[in-house]
From Swiss-Prot:
Family according to the record: Belongs to the PKI family.
GO BP terms, alphabetized: negative regulation of cAMP/PKA signal transduction; negative regulation of protein import into nucleus; negative regulation of transcription by RNA polymerase II; regulation of G2/M transition of mitotic cell cycle
Function: Extremely potent competitive inhibitor of cAMP-dependent protein kinase activity, this protein interacts with the catalytic subunit of the enzyme after the cAMP-induced dissociation of its regulatory chains.
Residues annotated as site: Important for inhibition: 16, 19-20
InterPro entries according to UniProt: cAMP_dep_PKI
Gene: Pkia
Alphabetized Pfam families for the sequence: PKI (PF02827)
Keyword vocabulary terms for this entry: Acetylation, Protein kinase inhibitor
GO CC terms of this entry: cytoplasm; nucleus
Region (Disordered): 49-76
Protein name, UniProt field: cAMP-dependent protein kinase inhibitor alpha
Organism field: Mus musculus
Length: 76
């Protein structure tokens, strides 16, 4: 019976009211990162691409793949 009382006393002393606060405890402990590091990481991202830049590369690659597939079919 004393084990239960000790566990209960520890729970009450922790200030937590249930599992709802468990996530908050984890987020607070992991938020110790440096904001300067975050700024440097965000500055390194390249988000200024011209519109359709990737689409043009993909479509030309897909077109060459389709052309090779059609050539293989015609040879067979």
């Amino acid at each position: 019976m004393t084990d239960v009382e000790t566990t209960y006393a520890d729970f009450i002393a922790s200030g937590r009211t249930g599992r709802r606060n468990a996530i908050h405890d984890i987020l607070v402990s992991s938020a110790s990162g440096n904001s300067n590091e975050l700024a440097l990481k965000l500055a390194g991202l390249d988000i200024n691409k011209t519109e359709g830049e990737d689409d043009g590369q993909r479509s030309s690659t897909e077109q060459s793949g389709e052309a090779q597939g059609e050539a293989a079919k015609s040879e067979s």
